[in-house]
Amino acid sequence: MAGVMKLACLVLACMIVAGPITANRALTCGTVNSNVAPCIGYITQGGTLPGACCTGVSKLNSMARTTPDRQQACRCLETAARALGPNLNAGRAAGIPKACGVSVPFPISTNTNCNNVK
């Protein structure tokens, strides 16, 4: 019985330690990209800003609660913006948060210093 209790305590301790580590890795570039995917047509071609874009930006902003999450989101957005290359309209990309009424703590750009994002 004492062996079972020791094992249970060890498992519980591992869960407590691993829980925050797993939570910190919840925001991936896949998650970021899927939320901003509805914005790509607007960024590259213009037109009307889709409601789904604003929904995605708002959802992403609410998921990025911690500094590491916001820095990760920044890096993912920076990489995605670079991938668009010459098709990127930087002004449209940077204006999305304001147009959607979302306060984002960093500009959507290819040259944001994501390490400074808090």
Curated annotation (Swiss-Prot):
GO molecular function: lipid binding
Function (record text): Plant non-specific lipid-transfer proteins transfer phospholipids as well as galactolipids across membranes. May play a role in wax or cutin deposition in the cell walls of expanding epidermal cells and certain secretory tissues.
Family: Belongs to the plant LTP family.
Coiled-coil blocks: none
Signal is among the record's keywords: yes
Signal peptide residue numbers: 1-25
Organism (species): Brassica oleracea var. italica (Broccoli)
Alphabetic keyword roster: Disulfide bond, Lipid-binding, Signal, Transport
Gene that encodes the chain: WAX9A
Gene Ontology biological-process entries: lipid transport
Domain of life: Eukaryota
Record bears the keyword Oxidoreductase: no
Short name of any one Pfam family annotated for the protein: Tryp_alpha_amyl
Cystine pairings recorded for this chain: 29-76, 39-53, 54-100, 74-114
Name assigned to this protein: Non-specific lipid-transfer protein A
